Design a protein with these regions (language model features):
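Short aromatic/basic micro-patch
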Residues: 2, 38-41, 72, 129, ...
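Alpha-helical membrane-targeting segments
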Residues: 18-40, 44, 84, 89-127
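Mid/C-terminal beta-alpha module of Rossmann-like enzyme folds, strongest
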Residues: 53-115, 131-156
Length: 156
């Protein structure tokens, strides 16, 4: 059995831990690419519940469990939602990926890099479940609402 989660949020995750300080302190927010790339963030508690269920229910066999959140959302829409939750006006600055790649490849060699080259790849194409082998549904789990979880993270 293979468990393949989407971008994990919650529980002090790296994604939100790096993103929120930028939104809290910067007026201009870099938007890698044009922001139309979609992703499907998943709450850590939902992933933990799925792993627990696979183990405790003694699920055997083969298969890939693609665990993704309740909705696919573009980075642009997600960033705008974060701004709204923070009650802050932010200007999203589209940044061509081919321009940012060399900068990130140098920056990631320092302790101050906001992200890695590998993480930058997530902005190149949609990161949503498509060819589902197995998912939360097969485990009788309904993933929590991604935007509500994001709002809770921001408020706490």
């Amino acid at each position: 059995i293979v468990i393949r989660p989407g971008v994990i949020i919650g529980g002090g995750d790296i994604f939100m831990k790096r993103l929120l300080p930028i939104f809290k302190t910067s007026f201009f927010i870099p938007l890698f690419g044009d922001g139309s790339t979609k992703f499907q963030p998943v709450f850590i508690d939902d992933v933990s519940l799925a792993v627990e269920k696979i183990i405790t229910d003694n699920i055997e066999g083969q298969g890939i469990y693609e665990l993704a959140g309740s909705r696919a959302i573009s980075y642009k829409d997600f960033y705008n939602y974060i701004s709204k939750c923070l009650n802050k006006t932010r200007v999203l600055v589209p940044t061509p990926l081919n321009l940012i790649k060399p900068i990130i490849s140098i920056a990631e060699k320092t302790p101050f890099s906001p992200l890695t080259s590998e993480q930058l790849l997530l902005f190149e194409k949609d990161n949503i479940i498509q060819n589902i082998d197995k998912s939360f549904k097969d485990l009788e789990i309904s993933p929590q609402d991604t935007l509500q979880i994001t709002k809770n993270i921001i408020e706490n």
